[in-house]
């Protein structure tokens, strides 16, 4: 068709890994319980929308606790919290086959990233917020670390649900 030359174009861009957990900052539970608070509704509805907009993904929904209490109770509490979020999603039309609840208890403490270090300069970058570190801090800083460890996250497990 009259073409004499060919060109090769190279693009360099970064793509965030889909398996990296996404922290949901606006999911809240009653103290020591797995009951979702009314303040969680907006965040939960955003997750429903995300899942409806992406019907081929499956996710792991994980809940984490702080160091307060014993390990077994924290593991049970976190699993019940993850299940509460999953139940909400199912009640809002998301297929249960796309959702895997996991309770990690205090097994996976937060690792301080650059953003957390900037927000809390006393937390060194790459520091694991585990018991050994937290107990070296003042009481008010311990509570900050405990609150950071109490979290709900999701990560994408598959992007091929119902495609084949």
Q: What are the residue ranges of the model-derived segments?
A:
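Conserved phosphate/oxyanion-binding catalytic-loop motifs
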Residues: 61
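Periplasmic OmpA-like peptidoglycan-binding domain that tethers envelope proteins to the cell wall
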Residues: 64-164
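Periplasmic peptidoglycan-binding/tethering modules of Gram-negative envelope proteins
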Residues: 1-58, 97, 119-122, 141-148, ...
